[in-house]
Amino acid sequence: MNEFPVVLVINCGSSSIKFSVLDATHCDVLMAGIADGINSEDAFLSVNGGEPAKLAHHSYEGALKAIAFELEKRNLIDSVALIGHRIAHGGNIFTASAIITDEVIENIRRVSPLAPLHNYANLSGIESAQHLFPGVQQVAVFDTSFHQTMAPEAYLYGLPWKYFEELGVRRYGFHGTSHRYVSQRAHDLLALQEEDSGLVVAHLGNGASICAVRNGQSVDTSMGMTPLEGLMMGTRSGDVDFGAMAWIASETNQTLGDMERVVNKESGLLGISGLSSDLRVLEKAWHEGHERAQLAIKTFVHRIARHIAGHAASLHRLDGIIFTGGIGENSVLIRRLVIEHLAVLGVKLDHEMNSLPNSHGERIISSKDTNVICAVIPTNEEKMIALDAIHLGKVNAPVEFA
């Protein structure tokens, strides 16, 4: 084993590979980057925010080869002791992270029809990493596994039983790695005992979800069988009356596939504003008086507040509301508006703390006389994946969480 082992974290998307290299002691990021445009002529690699370099080979393996070469240039290639893979969907098979074996790969393949765009890409990443890093232990970390502690009444749909029994149609939830990391950090920040605590975590980004965490376990979450359910998002509609979609399809002669495209790619902040799916653009328009941008933000906030309050009903006690994700960590406006909507819970905002930039890191943003503590905790999914890899794998280094 290398004296200074590192963990390579890989997140393969439908056309990209995001990667990070973290030291195995403190899980500090040593390098990070993205290969994008995979399987196209425009494929490129960018490392540490640098200029994109065109990839000679456009496949997942070609992109990983280029990433391995970058590690070699930095004398890190021989230090890779473990590889952690983010896997989009583990179905009801995986309730925790797992060391990758032939059986694990086969089970990932079995549940891949539940998330075909991402899981098959995840499998390509695993297979390519096995070829390029023979003998290096690999670990799969599932975005759905944290939510496998939900009770049937929380994950079942009100559909005929045969669809659950025969097809596995149920709520699985996503962003689990983020919700798990943030809830663990929240117990420290809020001085809570994990075994007797109640949190609602709001992961707000272009994709967004809420999670109720009781005694350290997920008991409810807003996303469902797919990431479409729940909150309104950048381009996703979130909760929508299926009858409305059936009526639109009938009136406009559109197919089910057309409707799926509409609710996934053309809705949400983009759909209402008609301007952008990027909240930063909409916030600027908000201050300029753009009415539909303002309406999009108000609708976004209303859904978030409603889901936070609803998820609190799954807890025995509400100790804290935690904001995370790109929007949750950076948008002073969204946090303020959401907390104002939650006055019914006795939540009060400290405007000065809320206005601090995200560079201030973990912080409490509620006032001292609030009934429920509100906080901002930057997520760190890469660190969570690396920690899981270290805990499951074999690496000769002392590990520190904080």
From Swiss-Prot:
Pathway participation: Amino-acid degradation; L-threonine degradation via propanoate pathway; propanoate from L-threonine: step 4/4
EC number(s) given by UniProt: 2.7.2.15
Organism: Citrobacter koseri (strain ATCC BAA-895 / CDC 4225-83 / SGSC4696)
Function as written in the Swiss-Prot or TrEMBL entry: Catalyzes the conversion of propionyl phosphate and ADP to propionate and ATP.
The protein's name in its UniProt record: Propionate kinase
Chain positions recorded as Mg(2+) binding sites: N11
UniProt: ATP binding residues: 11, 18, 175, 203-207, 278-280, 326-330
Name of the gene: tdcD
Active site feature: D143 (proton donor/acceptor)
UniProt keyword annotations, A-Z: ATP-binding, Kinase, Magnesium, Metal-binding, Nucleotide-binding, Transferase
Residues annotated as binding substrate: R86
